[in-house]
């Protein structure tokens, strides 16, 4: 038992040493921690990713040795409030998401990391939700639209009031890969689930599009949805 505790403590010490190395690197110029225009990934950026991956692997190893998945329990037992395992995992995911906008190979890596986390750890509810939506977004951005749609639609089926899921799909078909028919499907799905979207971008785009092509039937349909949205939106605090 004592040997096991010593091994776990040594892994925690290794994690904190890696975290200190990351903090040291961030004092230098990296794409993520600098301000201004995005840069190409440099050696500092790539080293940060590798350090965070080592940290994640060690956290998972601790979880396996403890035979628990809940990271909050690991935090309370082994980490200080200012540098918890949860915080380091969340920061790693944020970094991958940022770098993925520069290099799609990093987005592919983010898919692997989220799958690794989902298989081995239980994060807080908000981050679990964020990861499920982000995973679908990663698949979409790397060209696997079918997988992305399957994941996000399954998520919406189980959580029909989670606005970020609709927003994610809306962004796909408004900006990433414009498709007016698929955008209409997103709005139809929100209407079907009686979900009030935070923004009116989708409604506005559809009304203007159908008006421009002379499709009176669809223009009236989405104008009605839009008018109802405006009435309901005024009564809700987000």
Language model segments and positions:
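Short, Lys/Arg-enriched N-terminal segments with co-localized hydrophobic residues
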Residues: 1-6
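Acidic, Ser/Thr- and Gly/Pro-rich intrinsically disordered linkers and low-complexity segments
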Residues: 59-83
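Structural motif corresponding to the intra-repeat A-B loop/turn of tetratricopeptide repeats
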Residues: 99, 104, 142, 175-177, ...
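Alpha-helical repeat scaffolds
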Residues: 44-55, 104-118, 145-155, 179-193, ...
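Structural signature of alpha-solenoid helical repeat scaffolds
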Residues: 77-85, 123, 157, 194, ...
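Terminal, low-structured helical/coil segments at or just beyond the last alpha-helical repeat
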Residues: 202-205, 209-238
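Short coil turns that delineate tetratricopeptide repeat
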Residues: 126, 160, 195-197, 231
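Amphipathic alpha-helical repeat scaffolds of TPR domains
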Residues: 9-39, 43, 53, 76-101, ...
